Amino acid sequence: MDRLKQSLLDAPVIEKEEYQYFVHPISDGVPMLRPELLREIVIRIIRKAELEDVDKIVTPAAMGIHISTAVSLMTDIPLVVIRKRQYGLEGEVSLQQVTGYSESEMYVNDVYEGDKVLVLDDVLSTGGTLAGITGALEEIGAEIVDIVAVIKKVGGENKIDDSDFDVKTLINVDVEDMEVIIVDEQGDG
């Protein structure tokens, strides 16, 4: 059994405002992230993602950073982090992040018209984060070559489904009765 699947089956589930939320090293930083799990995930991303001609990896803070940093190190593709803090630098673009449990503004720098980007994220659940990111990247004029999320939580509304983007995932899960259920071990794409 692969490490990602087992780590999800072992993940504790909490309820946050009537939303069942799994707590996982990739999405939450707890329990601690073991290097062999991160290595497995990075290798699977590199095998699944369309990387040819990608100029930049784009990821949201905070939980996409560790995954994307490791992918950047393995591929020599530069990394851009979409942050929750505004710096007011030239070319900074703001975007709205609306998830199942929060709403916030995020900011992107160093992505320009014509850039070819790979978007990486930890979890695809409501699609709010990825919808905001893809909208901002389109507004900038960047070309989104591929989008990969490590884990997809199925069920419920997913804002990215209403877009022209297909998100690849490594594994798809659901949460029922406070337990993680594996829906598709191979994910999407």
Swiss-Prot record:
EC number per UniProt: 2.4.2.-
GO molecular function: transferase activity
GO BP annotations, alphabetical order: purine ribonucleoside salvage
InterPro entries (alphabetical): HGPRTase-like, PRibTrfase_dom, PRTase-like, Pur/Pyrimidine_PRTase
EC top class, as a word: transferase
Biological function: May catalyze a purine salvage reaction, the substrate is unknown.
Highest rank taxon of the organism: Archaea
UniProt xrefs under HAMAP family: Hypx_phosphoribosyltr (MF_01467)
Record's keyword terms, sorted: Purine salvage, Transferase
Family: Belongs to the purine/pyrimidine phosphoribosyltransferase family. Archaeal HPRT subfamily.
Record's protein name: HGPRTase-like protein
Coiled-coil residues: none
